[in-house]
Amino acid sequence: MATIDLDGPALAPPKGEVSNLDDPPNQNCLAYTVLILCAVITTICFLLRAYGRVYLLKKFQTEEILTTLAYGNYWGAAYATFKMVDTPGYFVHQWNVRLKDVIPTNYWILIFGVCYSFVLPFLKIAILVEWCRLFVPKGTRTKSIFWWGCMVIGFVQATSNTAIVVALNMQCNPHEAIWDFRIPGAKCWDLHKLQVASATIHLCCDIAIFLLPQQVIWKLKMSWKKRMGVSVIFGLGLLACVSAAVRLAVTVKYGKAADALYALAPLVFWATAEMTCGFFIVCVPCIPKILKETGVIRNIKRAFGMSTAPTNPNTADRYAKSGTKGSQLSSTGPKSYYKLDEDGVPLGTLKGSESTEYLRGNVNNGQGITRTTQIKITQDNRSTSDSEGHAAFPASQKPWGV
């Protein structure tokens, strides 16, 4: 058996090229930028969803479990990508890599592929489960085409990726031969067809997930503008379609490349971007709730000089109108506080006794004031009546319950 020079180049250099095994040219700075950026975006999206769903909405459902599992596997894949920065490096020609350095590279490629094959189905099934909660009422699920569509896509994702993970770990016998080519008598099969099949399945599922909710959204009973906004939010799945399509293209190119290590870099980048897009899509529905609860929208409006007053006529606007009708009310008692009906308007302060007609709702459709109630508060505990017949109440029996 011929001996293998493990310290020699992994590929014979082309004519006019000389192997540089000690300090090969690379683009590791670009790799760090792409990988760190994807990791930061993924982490921010995961934390935003956790804050919006678990902290604000007090919900920890199946979607949160799946998203957490996906995030854990994402870092398994990310760890493998960072390890490949050291050996062999990104955009390094194979003739500039020692043959022995291919062994750990093959190992980290296997780890990345397995984790990647867990991340995407976890995320996509989480998205589908959440959409079923939003768009399909209980008791009507088996009658809904949308629900069955979600079930079919989820089933395809679960079964196909389980099979892919099994196949990745059974591509060679013995198992160690997957990454260590030095093992004698090993039997392996071509992995490229499996990689292309995986990329094709994910692209088809991404397109189906992108199109699936559009018909349901445009049948919702809401204004055209709101339907457009909801459609855009759920249409962000187009990002996943683009990244999956490019990933499929670079996968096909990778299988045909003679310089496989050099062609590995774009494949890793686009697969990582595809996972990041998945986390972004999972996070987006939680952002409006977070912006509302944290007051970000209110602060943005103030920064641009826009009004932050509520626009619901059943609350503050109705009160403002009642204050312009010319009713002159007075009080000798302390300030009173009130709470409007449940429209999210904060407590306000009334200086003096004022009309409470706005609490009754817009009964006469804005046709004028039908009754005005005046309250006078005295400083003692006796129930009295003034000369104008206004009702007075002891401090311990305030009718507004404060």
From Swiss-Prot:
Belongs to the SAT4 family. Part of the gene cluster that mediates the biosynthesis of the tetraketides fugralins such as linear fugralin A and cyclic fugralin B, volatile compounds that play a role in the asexual reproductive cycle but are not involved in pathogenicity. One of the key features of fugralins is the presence of a double methyl group, which is only rarely encountered in fungal secondary metabolites. As the fugralins cluster does not contain an independent methyltransferase, the PKS FGR1 is probably responsible for adding two methyl groups to the same carbon atom. It comes from the Eukaryota. Its main location: membrane. It comes from Gibberella zeae (strain ATCC MYA-4620 / CBS 123657 / FGSC 9075 / NRRL 31084 / PH-1). Glycans are attached at N381. The lineage of its organism: Eukaryota, Fungi, Dikarya, Ascomycota, Pezizomycotina. Residues 324-334 have a biased composition (Polar residues). Pathway: Secondary metabolite biosynthesis. Residues 312-335, 378-402 are annotated as: Disordered. The chain crosses the membrane at residues 28-48, 109-129, 145-165, 232-252, 264-284. One of its GO terms (cellular component) is membrane. InterPro entries: Rhodopsin_dom_fungi, SAT4-like. The gene is FGR2. This is Fugralins biosynthesis cluster protein 2. It is found in: Membrane.
